[in-house]
């Protein structure tokens, strides 16, 4: 299979939201994933340049196979994960959240999360971001191992998203 990696457009927010919900609805351990991203959230994120959604599209079927949502929280955002790991105030603008990664079950096993991560990191590095942070449920070995293989390391365990346990993983670029 071949996949094309592109940035999503704001008008694709509904498709992305549907994919996220489909994945979440099919999960046995739904507490591993906190899908806060509604259609309006994703649309505004893209339109207001507060983030980007990278999508992998299967070139044969033209179906969206996976997505990786990146958020630029900014230093004034109280949810900036840099605050959780005690980054200095002047470094908080250098933080990007590797926020939501999903791959449709039909397209798993092709390394799409790794490919989407690498594509996003390349752009973030060029844009001057230094700290790439994400959260993973401690029992979600698949996501944790994927991120660790990409060079992320666990820096803290916290309660997030209404009291759910999460590991904060970081990669400096």
Residue ranges and their predicted role:
Residues 21-44:
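Conserved GNAT-fold acetyl-CoA-binding loop/helix
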Residues 124-136:
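Conserved GNAT acetyl-CoA-binding A-motif
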Residues 43-55, 71-77, 97:
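A short helix-loop-beta-strand connector motif used in the catalytic cores of GNAT acetyltransferases and
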Residues 63, 69-100, 161:
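Conserved acyl-donor/pantetheine-binding loop and adjacent beta-alpha core of acyl/acetyltransferases
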Residues 1-14, 18, 22-25:
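Conserved N-terminal entry element of GNAT/NAT acetyltransferase domains
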Residues 108, 134-144, 161-162:
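Conserved beta-strand-loop-alpha-helix junction that forms the acyl-donor binding cleft
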Residues 100-103, 109-122, 145, 149:
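Conserved acetyl-CoA-binding loop-helix of GNAT-fold acetyltransferases
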Residues 114, 126, 138-156:
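Conserved active-site alpha-helix within GNAT-family acetyltransferase domains
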């Amino acid at each position: 299979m071949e996949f094309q990696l592109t940035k999503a457009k704001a008008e694709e927010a509904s498709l992305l939201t549907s994919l996220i919900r489909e994945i979440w609805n099919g999960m046995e351990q739904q507490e591993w994933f906190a899908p806060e991203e509604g259609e309006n959230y994703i649309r505004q994120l893209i339109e207001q340049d507060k983030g980007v959604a990278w999508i992998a599209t299967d070139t044969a079927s033209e179906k969206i196979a996976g997505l990786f949502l990146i958020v630029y929280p900014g230093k004034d955002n109280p949810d900036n994960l840099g605050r959780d790991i005690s980054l200095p105030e002047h470094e908080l603008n250098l933080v990007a959240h590797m926020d939501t990664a999903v791959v449709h079950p039909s397209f798993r096993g092709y390394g799409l999360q790794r490919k989407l991560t690498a594509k996003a990191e390349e752009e973030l590095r060029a844009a001057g971001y230094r700290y790439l942070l994400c959260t993973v449920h401690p029992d979600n070995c698949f996501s944790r191992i994927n991120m660790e293989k990409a060079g992320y390391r666990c820096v803290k365990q916290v309660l997030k998203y209404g009291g759910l346990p999460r590991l904060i993983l970081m990669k400096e670029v």
